[in-house]
Amino acid sequence: MAKQVPERSKPNAGKPSIRKVWSVNGHRLKRHKLLRDLVLIMIAPVLVYLMASLFTYSKDDPGWSQSGSAIVHNIGGKAGAWIADVLFQLCGFVAFLLPVALGVVSWIALFGSDQEEQAEGHLEPALRLVGIVGFLIAATGLFHLHLFQSDVARAGGILGKQVCNSLQAGFGVFGTNLFVLMLLLISVTLATGLSWFALMERIGRAVLAVPPLLQKSKRRADEWQHARALREEREEVRKIDAVQRAKRDPMKIELPPEPIVEKSERAKRDTQIPMFLGVNKRGSDLPSLALLDNPKPQIKGYSDETLEALSRQIELKFKDFRIDVQVVGAYPGPVITRFEIEPARGVKVSQISALDKDIARGLSVKSVRVVEVIPGKSVIGLEIPNVNREMIFLSELLRSKEYDKSPSSLTLALGKNIAGRPTVADLARMPHLLVAGTTGSGKSVAVNAMVLSLLFKASHNDLRMLMIDPKMLELSVYQGIPHLLAPVVTDMKEAANGLRWCVAEMERRYKLMSVVGVRNLAGFNKKVKDAEEAGQPLMDPLFKPNPDLSEVPRPLQKLPFIVIFIDEFADMMMIVGKKVEELIARLAQKARAAGIHLILATQRPSVDVITGLIKANIPTRIAFQVSSKIDSRTILDQSGAETLLGHGDMLYLPPGTAMPERVHGAFVSDDEVHRVVEYLKASAPVQYVDGVLDEIQTMDDGVVIGPAGFPESASGGGDETDPLYDEALRIVTETRRASISSVQRRLRIGYNRAARLIEAMETAGVVSPPEHNGDRAVLAPPPR
């Protein structure tokens, strides 16, 4: 039988677990608190009874010092009278301190014992009892020495008399005072644990804190006096201002006339929306204005009384900063109200501009914009937001006479100015536009309003668009309208290809205008139209027929405007980079006369996105609300956009000026955009141009547009160093056809370049020389 091995004893065997120790300590603490509450309940009535008996003591009551059958006047009855008599006879006036001392010591003993083992200064109950006895002896002695009377009950009692007589016999009166005072201090320390040195330190700190408190009180008193003087001065200024206001001319309040927007003839004609979009004759007309929502009645801004009171408040706020101004005019608008202020002599404009945030805080408004220079006036503008902001609908602007009478096919309806008048701009005069602002400032809505402005002004025969939408949200809704050159671009590599096609188209148009002898697209279209009406159409001077085919020159056609929309320019810059910046810069520099225009939008107005090269070639800019003055200077070269209100509030910098104009942008809903898009889809089929998004962009003469937008030399292409040589070699060896027209058609290049590629293959031994019928044999084997 195997020997049984005893189990090893655990090292902590026999020791109580932590949970058990906590449980025992918890029960013990609970019992201690219960006992403490019971003792407090018993002691409190005793102390109250003792105090009441002492305060109602009467010498006529029977007690320890006298007997009798008189009526007891003590509230504590016979026992109370007897106890009070004993205490007064023994302790004198100290009897009143006895209940207080017992109460203090009991409180310390009961509620100061939880941390008795950890905290210093807590003594044993026996020492507390010794302290109480010593306190009674010392107190009775002091009372007997300093409050001595013939009646012992009025001094320190019998106990005090005996203590003082015993000590005076040996130490005299001075020594007795010292010993009794020493006994009093020691007894208080034993009974309560009080440290006299700590008490003196607290008293010293309190004494040292008195002078700063006095100084602070004096400073507050001085400030109160100063504020009182300022209030009196302000009241005096108000009285003087009231007298001056009564004498001067009333403030000029120029209210906009009603109605602000006069309807055009087209707006009166387009009053009903077509019931069936599909029955519209294709290519017959522009979209009907009835497709857009009608404006709703809205609450106007400030009343005349409010404007008058607000102007006085503006003057008083400037007086608070020691600047004297006078409000001379108020011009309420749909979103903001401009107050024209005339500063006193010697007041700089910079002083007023530096107070824009303080004035906004004083007037309890979101922001205040200071217009430092108003052309034609010697006043300063102060633009304050209205309490009730009006919403501006796009239909109001498109129905206005300003939009309808604009002769340009590239008219943009931007919004309303501060007076409520429609603001329209000609993209052909800009000729390019940069739009920037933070998220939620109304930038995307403004771009949609610009697109609809162009669609309501020009048909697809007069206007073509290339839309680049990196976010795939804002411009993708226009997919399928006949105005598009290509589907809405969401791939940034295809965006670069589309921009290269625009550069190639720009170069082609310049060559056509040079041959025809005109300076811009309008002159070219007019000359083509006049030639057609005269029955002698102009032939394409750049047409090069294919020798293999019998082709005749094509007559020149009217060239449409091309507008390139880029919704988020910063994303495209991050993905494609420097290549796109060079293409955009090249278009911005030369594309105006060719009828090609750019509208760039970005929500990140930083210097790495809006570079100096782009700003130099796009002088027309629109800034929506931005977060800082730095962003505003990046867009407009000046501050101001950081004080805009958002939701379409913009600063429009027209071409050729340095003073931005404040415009409130129009709102266009998604439903309105969808209705217009469906109408255009039903009116004409989509007419995409082949090759717009191809990677290789080649002009009619075989010249390739390089990555930077510059045409490569024709003489440099067509040999084995040509970037298309490998692709042409693959096509020839796969199809087993060495045809110039086949290579030209497959690669979408010019005839001359395709011929040079075939000749390079002949030199390399890939194809044979041409036979008597012009055919070539493919000598190289097909690719595996």
From Swiss-Prot:
Membrane-related topology note: Multi-pass membrane protein
Which parts pass through the membrane?
A: 38-58, 68-88, 92-112, 129-149, 178-198
Chief location bin: membrane
- A Pfam family in this protein? FtsK_4TM
List of residues binding ATP: 440-445
Which SMART domains does the UniProt entry name for this protein?
Answer: AAA, Ftsk_gamma
The source's domain of life comes to: Bacteria
Instruction: Give the FtsK domain ranges.
Output: 420-633
Record PROSITE patterns = FTSK (PS50901)
What GO biological process, any one, is recorded here? Answer: cell division
Q: What GO annotations for molecular function exist for this entry?
A: ATP binding; ATP hydrolysis activity; DNA binding
Q: Cite the entry's keywords alphabetically.
A: ATP-binding, Cell cycle, Cell division, Cell inner membrane, Cell membrane, Chromosome partition, DNA-binding, Membrane, Nucleotide-binding, Transmembrane, Transmembrane helix
Mind telling me which SUPFAM superfamilies this protein's record contains?
Answer: P-loop containing nucleoside triphosphate hydrolases (SSF52540), Winged helix' DNA-binding domain (SSF46785)
Q: Which InterPro entries match?
A: AAA+_ATPase (IPR003593), FtsK/SpoIIIE/SftA (IPR050206), FtsK_4TM (IPR025199), FtsK_alpha (IPR041027), FtsK_dom (IPR002543), Ftsk_gamma (IPR018541), P-loop_NTPase (IPR027417), WH-like_DNA-bd_sf (IPR036388)
- Subcellular localization: Cell inner membrane
Q: Name one GO cellular component term.
A: plasma membrane
Topological domain spans for side Cytoplasmic: 199-784
Subunit notes for this chain? Homohexamer. Forms a ring that surrounds DNA.
**What does the record's free text say on domains?**
Consists of an N-terminal domain, which is sufficient for the localization to the septal ring and is required for cell division, followed by a linker domain, and a C-terminal domain, which forms the translocation motor involved in chromosome segregation. The C-terminal domain can be further subdivided into alpha, beta and gamma subdomains. The alpha and beta subdomains multimerise to produce a hexameric ring, contain the nucleotide binding motif and form the DNA pump.
Name the job this protein performs.
Essential cell division protein that coordinates cell division and chromosome segregation. The N-terminus is involved in assembly of the cell-division machinery. The C-terminus functions as a DNA motor that moves dsDNA in an ATP-dependent manner towards the dif recombination site, which is located within the replication terminus region. Translocation stops specifically at Xer-dif sites, where FtsK interacts with the Xer recombinase, allowing activation of chromosome unlinking by recombination. FtsK orienting polar sequences (KOPS) guide the direction of DNA translocation.
Question: Which family would the database say this protein is a member of?
Answer: Belongs to the FtsK/SpoIIIE/SftA family.
User: What name does the UniProt record give this protein?
Assistant: DNA translocase FtsK
